[in-house]
Amino acid sequence: MKIRIAEYCGFCYGVKRAVDMAYKLAEANEASGTLGPLIHNPQLIEDLNTKGVPCRESLDEFQAGETVVFRSHGVGPDVYEAAHAKNLTILDATCPNVKAAQKKGQALAEAGYLPVIIGEKNHPEVKSIVQWAGKHAIVIERIKDIGNV
């Protein structure tokens, strides 16, 4: 059997950036962890864990002075506030494209618009965009749901 590898394969630039940031942190040997899985890749998450950057599910699992890595999917503004209040160092690995969507959603909401986000409402990336856009943002998961807006 012949196996061909696509010319362009591997992580997208946002994920590559997040992964590189996490491995540099591992090399620095600082007390740290990611808040939730950095990316959707269990093997990489386990490798980071063995290198001293474990996946943690809550800010409650961090001690003051530790570094928290925000996942590539982003987090809401309340998480930034809670991390600052806990005196954590933030390493923001949010994908630049996600960060741009968060800012756009926030700007639209602040300008009085109703942000409509198309995606899976329970996906971490969509959740983070909704949190920046405010509680009145709408998520559409299926085309048939558009008529309900």
Describe the predicted segments one by one.
Residues M1-V149:
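The feature marks the mature, well-folded catalytic cores of soluble enzymes
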